Amino acid sequence: MNEKCTVRRAFVASGQVQGVGFRPFVYRLAHEGGLTGTVGNTSEGVRMEVQGAEAEVRRFGQRLQAELPPLARLTGLKEEELPPVAQEDAFAIVQSSGHAGHSVLVSPDVGVCADCLADMADPQNPRYNYPFTNCTNCGPRYTITRSIPYDRAVTSMSCFPLCPRCAAEYANPADRRFHAQHVACPVCGPTLWFVGKEDAAAGRTCPQWVSVQDKEALTRLALERSGQVLLDGG
């Protein structure tokens, strides 16, 4: 086959491929190879359709298996030849689709990564001291997922619409939070509150919010006075 002729090939990846930065990874591979097409989550895993020169499509398939994101695990990869699509000029992440009778592995929750820890430690960073800082390489998955395919709309994060800054990160292919479904910040994401003994005794279930620094100070004070600190993940 002429390696410069245009071909179109579908790949269906199964395994731990949702909630692990797999679609952004595919998006970058396609752009680096000058390929057009689509990628989207399904209830079987992730479906990709790529179109371009035969050599680049073949290289895409090789890199797909050799350069997986850190949290991704492939258990299967199906390929299918498709007829080329005329006048297609871009590669896009498309809306997820699901079908009854299929299942996909859901990624476990992942401890905070070094990059996010650096964000939390930087006083100039918008996520300074924010306890729910995460990206495509870390953060909650399994415990916030209600159904598959994995998208923000079917997770606990659906209650927290993205602020303009987080939305810009989510839409930026060069950002490590590109298409991170659980992305959040102090402006738009979950927060914590401190309930003292007096609040509980008085039946106050919605005390005033306090900052991370205030919570740390109150927690230290409670421990210094031989108090108890309860963390509720509900």
Question: Predicted segment positions?
Answer:
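Intrinsically disordered, low-complexity, mixed-charge
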Residues: 1-193, 200-202, 209-211, 220-221
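Short intrinsically disordered, low-complexity segments
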Residues: 204-205, 226
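Flexible, low-complexity linker/loop segments at domain and module junctions
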Residues: 214-228
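Glycine-rich N-terminal segment of FAD-binding domains in flavoprotein oxidoreductases
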Residues: 229-234
